[in-house]
């Protein structure tokens, strides 16, 4: 016997699917939308209660969508299947935010870079370095994580950075990394890495356009600061 509360067990006028069909998805709350995805609750909580408590317990959708599968499955009522559903939804959301017509994303300002990577990087618990490879029209053609861990100039080697750009026929690059503290203020090492990569780029003929440091919903551009 299945003891899990399903959406169909709710009164018809309270079922989020019925409300979505009748009134449109935009009228549903975050909890209702999540309930539509997860579908079933537990023997002690119906799906609406579970969805609401899940969002509250993790600190909101931003935090929910940055949980690992291990963190999600520690939450009461969330098994591997529901954790996988949440992670898939999170990834789709991130990809949609970075999608533009024709899959082309043109960089005109540091804000464009922030909009592209912020959702993926702002709540990371470790430092991660991304490289964005651009063509001659400043359209992003490739994005890759090249390093995870504490960044310093002895570890981040220009060869690893520019090798990707050369393989992908890049005209220029932008690097991005996050500060897990949430404060994007550049460290001395951040500045040293930036200057080193800028000089190497000049020699190779692939310009480092910017180094963006991501914090919690804020960023710093080395170009805007005048570092490069």
Curated annotation (Swiss-Prot):
Signal peptide: none annotated. Residues 106-228 form the MPN domain. It comes from the Bacteria. One of its GO terms (molecular function) is metal ion binding. It holds the Pfam family UPF0758_N. GO terms for biological process: proteolysis. InterPro entries: MPN, RadC_JAB, RuvA_2-like, UPF0758, UPF0758_CS, UPF0758_N. Keywords: Hydrolase, Metal-binding, Metalloprotease, Protease, Zinc. Zn(2+) binds at residues 177, 179, 190. NCBIfam families: PRK00024.1 (NF000642), radc (TIGR00608). PANTHER family: DNA REPAIR PROTEIN RADC, UPF0758 PROTEIN YEES-RELATED. Belongs to the UPF0758 family. This is UPF0758 protein CLD_1541.
């Amino acid at each position: 016997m299945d003891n899990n509360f399903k959406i169909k067990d709710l009164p018809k006028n309270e079922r989020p699917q019925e409300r979505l069909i009748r009134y449109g998805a935009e009228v549903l709350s975050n909890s209702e939308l999540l309930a539509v995805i997860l579908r079933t609750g537990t023997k002690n909580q119906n799906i609406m209660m579970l969805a609401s408590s899940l969002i509250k317990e993790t600190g909101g959708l931003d935090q929910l969508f940055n949980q690992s599968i291990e963190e999600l499955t520690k939450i009461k009522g969330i098994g591997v299947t529901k954790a996988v559903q949440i992670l898939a939804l999170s990834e789709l959301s991130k990809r949609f935010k970075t999608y533009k017509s024709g899959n082309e994303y043109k960089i005109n300002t540091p804000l464009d870079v922030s909009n592209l990577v912020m959702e993926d990087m702002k709540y990371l618990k470790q430092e991660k370095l991304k490289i964005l490879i651009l063509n001659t029209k400043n359209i992003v053609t490739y994005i890759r994580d090249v390093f995870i861990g504490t960044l310093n100039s002895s570890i981040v080697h220009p060869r690893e950075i520019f090798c990707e750009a050369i393989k992908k026929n890049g005209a220029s690059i932008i690097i991005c990394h996050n500060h897990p503290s949430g404060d994007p203020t550049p460290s001395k090492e951040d500045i040293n890495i930036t200057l080193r990569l800028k000089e190497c780029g000049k020699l190779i003929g692939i310009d480092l356009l910017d180094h963006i440091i991501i914090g919690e919903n804020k960023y710093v551009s080395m170009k805007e600061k005048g570092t490069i």
